[in-house]
Amino acid sequence: AAYYKMTLNGKSITSSHLNPGFTHYDKRNLYNTYDVTSQLLKGENVLSAILGNGFYNESAPVATWSYEQARWRNRPRMICEMEILYKNGEKQTIHSDSTWKTSIGPYIQNNIYSGDTYDACLAIAGWDKPGFDDSKWTNAIQAAAPSPLLVSQNMPAIETEQFITPINMRSFGDTVYVYDFGVNMSGVCTLSINGKKGTKVSMQHGELLKLSLIHISEPTRP
């Protein structure tokens, strides 16, 4: 339940986003399947995941539909299997269990409505690639299933349709910048940052501009 980002040998196993789809998480949960044959390496392979809260563990009190009061709320959890079919016809199944290793990471807070807090100082280089030493990490804890039903997701996935660059930028001093993308859309921002360790960068999204400023009193989503 909740959202995940999964990689195999450091590369994402899918181009889609916000998986799996929404359900009443205490009644049924969706799972996704992927063909990762092209990402397998000879020798060691590393399957890794980052878990996010999604709508399963929505905590923001301003959440539409009061998801913060949902009866299914709980900490994110996952289950996965990898089926390997060899040329000789033999099949091997690798599944998640308490032998998997876990650690804190740079995503120290994440929320559908209020966004993410990412601390680059906590980023761990190479953590999802072969050769990484996870001996100091802790073992995963087996958790109860959120619901009795696990169902294959048939709905279309959320995919990136296009990349949009700002049509205008206005600065207010040397610390505040407003970028106008010229269209109301669902998406995420990408940026490259150079700065001293400990520097904080905040992004506020808005649906309207008034007097070149983000008008945050109107319905907006971060």
Region roles according to the model:
Residues 1-213, 217, 221:
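Extracellular/oxidizing-compartment recognition motifs
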